[in-house]
Amino acid sequence: MEGVSALLARCPTAGLAGGLGVTACAAAGVLLYRIARRMKPTHTVVNCWFCNQDTVVPYGNRNCWDCPHCEQYNGFQENGDYNKPIPAQYLEHLNHVVSGSPGPRAPAQPLQWVSSQVLLCRRCSHHQTAKVKQLAAFSPRDEGRYDEEIEVYRHHLEQMYKLCRPCQAAVEHYIKHQNRQLRALLLSHQFKRREADQTHTQSFCASAVKAPAQVIVLRALAFLACAFLLTTALYGTSNPFAPGAPLPPTLPTGSNGSAPPDNGTATGAEGWRQLLGLLPEHAAEKLREAWAFGQSHQMGVVALGLLTCLLAMLLAGRIRLRRIDAFSTGLWALLLGLHLAEQYLQAASPSWLDTLKFSTTSLCCLVGFTAAVATRKATGPRRFRPRRSEKQQ
């Protein structure tokens, strides 16, 4: 340790460059670690194009899977066609009727779809069949105006094969009945989706508030580094772990610069000496060496504090980013700049630089303590806002 201290004392610029290099390498290593952890998921959630139901499938089958709800194949090309041949499209014996049992929350009366033969009379049903056949056999005079010609032809068939009054009334009543049932299903679907969004938002907020353990440890380490700098500024060149070490000097109150004896100060000094006497000799020696090393390399301690703040912000992520973390990092950067200016000026440094450095260290210590203690409040996502329907928009 003494050899490293002597080397850094001879080459302060090299020591600073080495500290900055270690900081950059550590930050790059953490960034590469986070990028490497972003692996593709094994499963993903897909939505059926036919029944609009969500299903969890393997990640490799996200564009080729069968829906377990409606048993339809979901796999499409860029032009909208299927990405594989479907024999059931042209072989009738491969198709079967799909039926499902209603869920516990399903309405007591499910949707009932009736055919035109049940809803219409024999004459109107025959007319509708003839109209469909004639529309299927329609051939336009000009292929470029196919849409216009078939619309005119459809209107002509509607006028020719009008429904009788009883059938027209039955059709209108049936349409109103289906509209009511579909509206109830739509409202129920929107309500369930809103409940799912609220549950997801609440769980996401709960996970966003809790900071990881490594982030809390890094914030505490930054506070301890700043507390060490503040303590060294208060003690000056003295070592508090040395035998017979005094307490931090107090401001003089007399006109001649000498402070009157204080019983509280004397009692505190005696208690500190007794506490040091309880420590083993080798432990006290290690503490003295660590104090001397940190006191002679305060710029390295400042670089360590700045590195811990940056790593804490990087590991916390954008969701848990707080203003106090950014403010603490700015104070650490300012403190590093003041130490660099003091080392550059050396003997010609002005007196106000020490005052500014002590004030910045005190403020950084206070902000670091607040950032280390207040670990439950995060910016997180905003308050949940329910989606508006198309009519409200």
Curated annotation (Swiss-Prot):
Record's keyword annotation contains Acetylation: yes
Primary location class: nucleus
Transmembrane segments: 215-235, 299-319, 324-344, 358-375
Region (Disordered), start-end ranges: 246-266
GO biological process: angiogenesis; nuclear migration along microtubule; positive regulation of endothelial cell migration
Membrane topology: Multi-pass membrane protein
Subcellular location: Nucleus inner membrane; Cytoplasm, Cytoskeleton, Spindle pole
GO CC annotations on file: cytoplasm; nuclear inner membrane; nuclear membrane; spindle pole
Assembly and interaction partners: Interacts with SUN2 and LMNA. May bind to Ran GTPase; has a greater affinity for Ran-GTP over Ran-GDP.
Protein name: Transmembrane protein 201
Species for this entry: Bos taurus (Bovine)
